[in-house]
Amino acid sequence: MESHFNWYGVPRLQKASDACPRESCSSALPEAREGANVHFPPHPVPREHFSCGAPKPVAGAPALNASLMDGGALPRLVPTSSGVAGACTARRRPPSPELLRCSRRRRSGATEASSSSAAVARRNERERNRVKLVNLGFQALRQHVPHGGANKKLSKVETLRSAVEYIRALQRLLAEHDAVRAALSGGLLTPATRPSDVCTQPSASPASASLSCTSTSPDRLGCSEPASPRSAYSSEDSSCEGETYPMGQMFDFSNWLGGY
């Protein structure tokens, strides 16, 4: 039996002389001649028939006969499984190396930004602690310098200047004290002598004094030998030690330190 379909599944036209009489076909196909086969262009097959999924019927297209496909006219399409269909639909183009480099650069930039922000926070915390300790040190220094505890708060520069002047004044005071001590130990300076009646009580009558002198032990000479001036100085020094320097002649340290 001769097949009436071509390779594309489109019905093949018969000869004009076999299909219909000349007079009936001449009106339908005026250009057809006797003995000539008239072929139509193949019917376009939609792209969906070649996709991974099942073929979808197209409106207006003739349906394919399964017997003709078995006969060898068209190869039968192998039904695809769901996994293959999913793999086909999920197949994507792999990312380019430029995109990979950009993504790595973005990730590295984010990590660097987070690490730099943490470093800045730690540096700011250290700076705040340093400033706090410096302020506490200046506050303690103001309590030791003259006029540091006044109502007027001294600035840092004024506090340092007052501390330097106070240290220099203390050094001068120590130098003067050392010089006076060295002069006294070398005998260059002697304390002023004063009459004995200033420090001692009035003595008894001359008779009682001579009686007391003669009543001493016989091995001593009594009062015939005059007393040495050194012993008199030592007794005077021991009895009048608190009145050697009057209070008016003492150095006024409070007025001297008040200028600083």
UniProtKB/Swiss-Prot annotation:
InterPro entries in UniProt: bHLH_dom, HLH_DNA-bd_sf, MASH1/Ascl1a-like
SUPFAM superfamilies: HLH, helix-loop-helix DNA-binding domain
Entry's induction text: Transiently repressed after nerve injury.
Cell compartment(s), UniProt: Nucleus; Cytoplasm
Keywords: Cytoplasm, Developmental protein, Differentiation, DNA-binding, Neurogenesis, Nucleus
PROSITE patterns: BHLH
Function, as annotated: Transcription factor. Binds to E-box motifs 5'-CANNTG-3' in the regulatory elements of target genes, probably as a heterodimer with another basic helix-loop-helix (bHLH) protein such as the transcription factor TCF3. May bind both open and closed chromatin, acting as a pioneer transcription factor to allow other factors to bind and activate lineage-specific genes. Required during post-implantation development for the generation of some differentiated trophoblast cell types.
Biological process according to GO: cell differentiation; chorionic trophoblast cell development; in utero embryonic development; negative regulation of Schwann cell proliferation; negative regulation of T-helper 1 cell differentiation; negative regulation of T-helper 17 cell differentiation; negative regulation of T-helper 2 cell differentiation; negative regulation of transcription by RNA polymerase II
Keyword Nucleus in record: yes
Record GO terms (molecular function): bHLH transcription factor binding; DNA-binding transcription activator activity, RNA polymerase II-specific; DNA-binding transcription factor activity; DNA-binding transcription factor activity, RNA polymerase II-specific; DNA-binding transcription repressor activity, RNA polymerase II-specific; E-box binding; protein dimerization activity; RNA polymerase II cis-regulatory region sequence-specific DNA binding
Cellular component, GO, one term: cytoplasm
Tissue: Expressed in Schwann cells in the peripheral nerve (at protein level). Also expressed by endothelial cells (at protein level). May be expressed in neuronal precursor cells.
Oligomer status and interactors: Efficient DNA binding requires dimerization with another bHLH protein. Forms heterodimers with bHLH transcription factor TCF3. May not heterodimerise with bHLH protein HAND1.
bHLH domain boundaries: 118-170
Keyword Heme recorded: no
Positions with biased composition (Low complexity): 110-121, 200-218
Span list, region Disordered: 85-126, 191-239
Coiled-coil parts of chain: none
Name of this chain's protein: Achaete-scute homolog 2
